[in-house]
A protein has these predicted regions:
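Residue-level marker of positions within ordered structural domains that often coincide
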Residues: 21, 35, 76, 167, ...
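Soluble catalytic domains of enzymes that build or remodel membrane lipids, polysaccharides, and related
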Residues: 98-99, 104-118, 124-246
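N-terminal signal-anchor transmembrane helix
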Residues: 50, 67-119
Length: 246
């Protein structure tokens, strides 16, 4: 039972630490593990019920509270939570499809990604972590996507933007570091519609990247501030490095 109670203590710590407004990755780790912690709570509850003679009811109630705590948050990001969607009006533009992919810089399966583009045929596609190898390989796609903007980097923060629509205006932002870009791409369609695509890829808080979430949080806050200034229909897309379950 020592192991059982040790796991419970770990569950409690990982659940409570993110409630503190500390940007160190240790405090933010629990945010990324919410799904795991929810299932861990279920397993611990099940084990406790099976061994009810050894596990006090108060422990089971505590585990149930943590299960509800995590499940309530995750539920908002599932299909069970129906979000209100505005009906398409008569003067709406035609549908636009966008495909965004973090291709993982060290992945060399170029053809598999290109087949994905051929299959889905999006109007716009974006690659994140794309370096010079990916830029060269994806040139075969430029016949169908003549409008491009390329930020080729070898630090896993490269970005490449490909579009069937003309790029009316494009800005590169470096909100938190001079080697971590974000893109602000303005479109003006023939029907007269204006919209903006904002591509972001801030660094995550982790032992191997950033010791805290300051750069990630700063990047996302800077993007939010910029969105208020733009005051146009905007799509924010990319790898936000917040939590996988959202």
């Amino acid at each position: 039972m020592i192991l059982y109670y040790s796991i419970i203590v770990l569950l409690i710590k990982l659940s409570i630490l993110p409630l503190f407004k500390n940007q160190h990755w240790v405090f933010r780790l629990g945010d990324f593990l919410k799904v795991h912690l929810m299932y861990l709570a279920i397993i611990l509850i099940g084990f406790g019920i099976i061994n009810y003679e050894k596990v006090p009811v108060t422990i089971l109630l505590l585990l149930f509270i943590f299960f509800i705590f995590h499940a309530k948050t995750i539920l908002r990001y599932t299909t069970l939570n129906k979000l209100p969607v505005k009906n398409k009006s008569e003067d709406s533009s035609s549908n636009i499809t966008i495909l965004s992919a973090n291709i993982y810089q060290y992945n060399k399966d170029f053809q598999k990604f290109q087949n994905l583009i051929y299959k889905n045929n999006p109007d716009i596609f974006i690659t994140l972590e794309s370096n010079s190898d990916w830029e060269i390989s994806n040139r075969v796609l430029e016949n169908n996507y003549p409008f491009t903007h390329k930020v080729t980097l070898e630090n896993t923060y490269g970005m490449h933007f490909y579009s069937k629509f003309a790029l009316r205006d494009i800005k590169e932002h470096y909100f938190v570091a001079d080697d971590i870009p974000s893109l602000e791409v303005h479109f003006h369609l023939k029907e007269g519609y204006h919209f903006v695509v904002f591509v972001v890829h801030p660094p995550p808080p982790s032992p191997t990247e950033e010791v805290n979430s300051k750069e990630r949080d700063g990047e996302l806050l800077s993007v939010a501030k910029r969105l208020n200034e733009i005051n146009k229909p905007t799509i924010v897309i990319g790898d936000l490095n917040n939590v996988g379950w959202a």
